[in-house]
Amino acid sequence: MKALKTAIFAATMMSGATAMAAEVSGNVALSSDYFFRGIDQSGGEALSGGFDVAFESGFYVGTWASSIDFSGGLELDYYAGYGGSISDSVSYDVGYLYYGYPQGPTTEEFEEFYGSISFGDATVGFALSDDYYASTGSSTYVYVDYGFALGEDYSLGFHYGNMTADDAANEADDYSVSLSTEAAGLGLDLSWIDSSENGGLFADNQFVLTISKSL
């Protein structure tokens, strides 16, 4: 596991030496809250950011971090994958993602293998883990996303996801609707998030505002 994370990080750091064959991008965002599959991760405002290296071959690597309110207050993820097109309107993506909590117990960290296929504006995907967060057993997450432009300045997105797991405490359906636009070089996103569960950390008719900047 450590070797794979090191390899992903090393490939990302080497991006400067392969600028002719790769595109490097970054992002930073401030959100009024951070939800992951319908579960609150930050208990309030969250600062996040990351960067990606995309190669001409379709291979990519990246890392992403966010403030959270558990496991020492920091989530640090590493990922690598491959994406391509089957036709002008059909594309696919497969990869590996490691969820790290460097200031918390290593037993809380976990990995997933993911895949998706997109048909025009719609995407269907999945994520599989054989040992989910805090060693709670296997999990399967499937989702459907659909988005489209509203005129020239706005876009509207819809999301539905379903989580099944050995630990029933992790199981839920999550839903969201998001309205996005850009202003003064910033991305603005207002999302409504809900889940099939009530109470605890599960989303219950929440609204989240995110301001982001691509680098």
List where the protein language model places each region.
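Outer-membrane beta-barrel proteins
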Residues: 2-11, 15-215
